[in-house]
Amino acid sequence: MRILMLGNSFTTANNLPQALASLTGAEVVCCARGGARLSEQLNSNTRLGSQTRAALQNEEWDYVVLQEMSHGPITAPRSFFSSVEGLCRQIRANGAVPILFATWAYQRGGAKLTAKGWDYNEVARTLSEAYHKAARENNTLIADVGRRFYELAGTRNLYAADGVHPSELGSHIVAETIASVINQHEEAKL
């Protein structure tokens, strides 16, 4: 099995691709850049976009994981939805299955969330709604990591010191959530 991960520092943090490979037994390749949005992955005029296009045109994948910039579904929803649609078309043309990696709200009470003047519950809800809408509209699988973070946030330290990125435990939960979606999909094919 081969998995391509498209994202940014949320996707590369704490060796997430290697953790996903360990949990699935798959070869995992990552096309990511810190701060990248899915629109950049779709734009072949960017370095990252040309890497993504080459990977989708020249290699075979079983799954492609899509991760948008942390608050992109809220601050740039039009770009988010159109980028998911465009990438899903390319992924399916490759013969692969797209998976949306639904991200989390910044840490409750954290400096970054406070500085933006955002409400934790509202951000978590809006992100979840956007990812689920994109999944429905594009008939994709969804790894709802944001929901797992929301459920576990009061009981575990899921965030790095910046209150934005995942801690090692947070990245492990990301890997487990994505692996679970893949394993369930593989079992359903039997």
Give residue spans per PLM region:
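Alpha-helical scaffolding segments of alpha/beta enzyme cores, especially the outer helices
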Residues: S79-A93, E122, T126-K133
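Short beta-alpha junction loops
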Residues: A102-Q107
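Alpha-helical structural signal in soluble globular domains
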Residues: A19-L23, Q90, A130-N138
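Conserved SGNH/GDSL esterase-like catalytic core that processes O-acyl groups on lipids
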Residues: R2-L6, F10-E85
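General small-molecule cofactor/ligand-binding pocket signal
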Residues: V29-C31, I99, L141-A143
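Extracellular/periplasmic catalytic domains that process cell-envelope and extracellular macromolecules
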Residues: L56-E59, A93, R136-E137, I173
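A short helix->loop->beta-strand "cap" motif at the edges of active sites that frequently abuts
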Residues: R89-I99, T140
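Catalytic His-Asp segment of secreted/periplasmic serine-dependent ester chemistry enzymes
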Residues: R108-K112, K116-L190
